[in-house]
A protein has these predicted regions:
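Active-site rim beta-loop-alpha module in soluble metabolic enzymes
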Residues: 152-221
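Polyanion-binding loop/helix "lid" in catalytic or ligand-binding cores
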Residues: 167-171, 228-233
């Protein structure tokens, strides 16, 4: 069915405009298209570059490692597009539309920005997401039977009286160990569908969630605190678990919601996180 996986006239996938040969198995994901160049300026060689809408992709070499950097844009819906198309590039025969007999694993490393919800996580620090909670249930559109969520569901029902089905997804243990260090905080990331109301912000419209932040920051599961709010990580983790890829998410903490603080130099903090990731990739 040509309407399921849509290809462009040149055979590239619809949104990313990539062909299989353009893609490395090691992929850095960022939200902002302008952040792609902040990473690839460190590369020794650029092999390929393309942009369509907010999706900018550059493949090149850093310390002899072939790496693709892709901007996803903002939010769960964009991650759904990007991960489906990345998986199709390596696991679908684009000529026939059939699934390949031998499936490939991608290594997905997100470099993002986030706001902390605990007062012991300072602005300008780095945070690596051990797990991530899809608080708005975006991935419930998919068959999640292969995800073992019973333990977390029991916890959230019993300790927080939340009866809705909320899923918690794990990072790749291998990548977590690779990128974790004493220089970073770690914990559970809360992935929200938006920036304002779903993260407890009220500007001119009142928020229908009372004490939203107070409830979220009390989550403590499997020896990890809920640490930060953002809009992508749980979808990356959940889809990677379902599709068989490895994923890790690192965030530059630009705000602390508890302390009502924001970074005085966010660009510098993001640059520092980029350096941290590239040294360990």
């Amino acid at each position: 069915d040509k309407s399921e996986l849509i290809l462009n006239g040149d055979g590239s996938v619809y949104h990313l405009k990539l062909k299989p040969k353009n893609l490395s198995s090691k992929i850095i994901l960022v939200g902002d298209p302008f952040r792609v160049d902040k990473i690839t300026k460190h590369f020794e060689k650029i092999e390929f570059e393309v942009q369509n809408r907010e999706f900018k992709s550059v493949t090149g070499y850093y310390n002899s490692n072939r790496i693709t950097v892709i901007s996803t844009g903002i939010g769960s819906g964009n991650i759904d597009i990007v991960l489906n198309e990345l998986d199709a590039l390596v696991n679908i025969d684009l000529n026939t539309g059939k699934i390949n007999k031998s499936l490939k694993k991608l290594e997905l490393i997100r470099i993002g920005t986030s706001g902390a919800i605990q007062n012991n996580i300072p602005v300008d620090s780095f945070l690596i997401s051990k797990m991530a909670i899809d608080v708005d249930g975006f991935l419930l559109n998919y068959d999640l039977t292969k995800i073992d969520n019973a333990k977390f569901n029991n916890y959230i029902n019993k300790e927080h009286q939340i009866q809705e089905e909320i899923y918690c997804y794990k990072s790749s243990e291998e990548l977590f160990n690779k990128f974790n260090s004493t220089d970073v905080k770690s914990g559970i990331t809360i992935t929200c569908s938006g920036f304002y109301s779903s993260q407890g912000r009220s500007i001119r419209l009142n928020n229908s969630y009372n004490n939203h932040l107070d409830k979220l920051k009390k989550i403590y599961y499997d020896n990890n605190n809920a640490t930060n709010l953002e809009m992508e990580t749980a979808i990356i983790y959940g889809m990677s678990n379902l599709l068989g890829h490895k994923a890790i998410s690192l965030n530059a903490i630009l705000a602390n919601r508890e302390l009502e603080e924001y970074s005085a130099n966010p660009d510098k903090t993001i640059e520092n996180l980029i350096d941290y990731v590239l040294k360990r990739i």
